[in-house]
Amino acid sequence: MKLPIYLDYSATTPVDPRVAQKMSECLLMDGNFGNPASRSHVFGWKAEEAVENARRQVAELVNADPREIVWTSGATESDNLAIKGVAHFYSGKGKHIITSKIEHKAVLDTCRQLEREGFEVTYLEPGEDGLITSALVEAALRDDTILVSVMHVNNEIGTVNDIAAIGELTRSRGVLFHVDAAQSTGKVEIDLDKLKVDLMSFSAHKTYGPKGIGALYVRRKPRVRIEGQMHGGGHERGMRSGTLATHQIVGMGEAFRIAKEEMAQENARVLALRDRFFAQIDGLEELYINGSMTSRVPHNLNVSFNYVEGESLIMALKDLAVSSGSACTSASLEPSYVLRALGRNDELAHSSIRFTFGRFTTEEEIDYAAKKVVEAVSKLRELSPLWDMYKEGVDLSQVEWQAH
């Protein structure tokens, strides 16, 4: 077993060796290095063939038409393209957008930008279980609503929203529905032939593919129109200009092909690992699971250890790569906005740790990690006067602290 142990698979995943091999074949002079847009010679034709094969592999994982897949630089760009693209194209129809308070920053900050441009955005509050329901969406719908954007799987707490029910609602009301699915490919079944979803964002690096490549699903029937945000050579049917990165696209295609083949057994294995880990830390007092345990992806466990500062726990767990909050916001010392939206107080939000397991996690690593967590939490609590007061039965919420 090698240290440190990586337990932050929701931040990023290592590239699968099979993916790296396919990518390496698209770089050198004797490989498939051509520009897919070069129509006048065999180097371009071969590259285009590889790109279209990858487009088909991405489409097959989510049961879409390959023509509905648009390449982007990642899920952040896909979110921007979907939300701004719809808002700008359909602004004559209405200027109201619905999203939730626990979306990824790529969605929230895009919506904030649209607010500066004169759009109105409603931010839904999840229940304590971290779920956004169709009833919540329905209550916020208005005559001038043009778009609903709700994530499939939450990046911090791993909860899975019922996008099928939300899709039925939005389609019946003639409102477009965008789903950020960066965290769900390879973990949750997605069937875009059945789901009434109009736009869906994908990322390669959350699914054992390379960073810097993603895709946006744009439905053809009923047809969804978006305004391109990147202008240039008119690539991707005008929706996203820029020379296609063959090696990254091929990597994403291969990663999604593997995800389709191995998802069922992979999920069962990772769920067993998570259950094994949780069983070993469950004996700790004042341990709170964040988000629903039933509507949740198998690889995520987000827990708060009361009376322990999350940052100090991460420092104590120097052999474990884990995070508090998401990777994109872990540099800030603010408590997780996702956990605050669930109704957690600042103390519990600050004491949360996200453990995420994946393809290369072993039982040996799980057992070692659980042992280290129990030791670190117990040690930090021994040092905490608040823990002593709690153990003595003092109600800390009633204590009036003196300011110095």
Swiss-Prot record:
It holds the Pfam family Aminotran_5. It is an enzyme of class 2 (transferase). Pathway: Cofactor biosynthesis; iron-sulfur cluster biosynthesis. The modification N6-(pyridoxal phosphate)lysine is found at residue 206. This is Cysteine desulfurase IscS. GO terms for cellular component: L-cysteine desulfurase complex. Keywords: 2Fe-2S, Cytoplasm, Iron, Iron-sulfur, Metal-binding, Pyridoxal phosphate, Transferase. Its cofactor is pyridoxal 5'-phosphate. Its EC number is 2.8.1.7.
